[in-house]
UniProtKB/Swiss-Prot annotation:
InterPro entries: Ammonium/urea_transptr (IPR029020), NH4_transpt_AmtB-like_dom (IPR024041), RhesusRHD (IPR002229). GO terms for cellular component: plasma membrane. This is RH-like protein. PANTHER family: AMMONIUM TRANSPORTER, BLOOD GROUP RH(CE) POLYPEPTIDE-RELATED.
Amino acid sequence: MSSKYPRSVRGCLPLWALTLEAALILLFFFFTHYDASLEDQKGLVATYQVGQDLTVMAALGLGFLTSNLRRHSWSSVAFNLFMLALGVQWAILLDGFLSQFPPGKVVIKLLSIRLATMSAMSSLISVGAVLGKVNLVQLVVMVLVELTAFGTMRMVINNIFKTDYHVNIMHIHVFAAYFGLTVAWCLPKPPPEGTEDKEQIANSPSLSAMLGALFLWIFWPSFNSALLTNPIERKNAVFNTYYALAVSTVTAISVSSLAHPQGKINMTYMHNAVLAGGVAVGTSCHLISSPWLAMVLGLVAGLISIGGAKCLPDWLPDPLQHWGTQLGHGDSSHVWFPDRFAPKSQNMESTSCG
């Protein structure tokens, strides 16, 4: 469906975005250069492969998870890709400027792109709370402000607590969830004309959203291990993330079916609950030395995710109740925070388990 903004506004919004892109090109021209060091070819290929996994998670996983709004069922994927492309550029510059004193030219490495992609995912998580309620320029401002705040927060945490990149980036779930809630809460009320139609859920949202969840599920071990440099820690992170995801998936599907009077699986809850284990072990995945610990975390995460989805929506005020199902998609900290729990909807799809 076409935009309901006036023609004059529709013409200005893309021009603002193009102007910003031109400014970014100038910043890259004056303040960046490629790393000239010779890297080991084997290590270079491995680094690039991890970067590919992260891009698939961001572009396809989070993109399809936003496709359950009727007017944004497919355009949400384009908005997601737009924010990702813009966010990666800004995050590379921001991380470079914040990490060196005095500021100089930013050296771009594959690690820089990998870290920037993970940082940009914070805005893709938060946008679930406002998709359908903001225009293109507002999305651009949201990306720039959020990534600046997230990068500054990581720098402060690193300087005070002396943590590494892995621990810093794992705060993305908490930060993005509450940033998205804050933006949604600050948007003007009542919404502009036509917003109610934009907010309506599509009749069959589960297929594309579940496809996004599958992309995230498959590549989540890469996300949790992307910034670890010690081979043993990376191996532990991959193993523990996989076991936690597997157990949380079995738990979520079983409990969802058990809680339904007719034994059906609520697919809307599944989009996020199957990923609960990956979020739960994110910060400590490289420290867990035995698979049973990760499996217990996955079990608890699945129980909390489904239990919260079933019980908490009635207690949440607007706009948290309506937008809780959108906020953070599959990558948010739905294990711990009530803003992740989905509201009841007549359009929720269920699948019989027996």
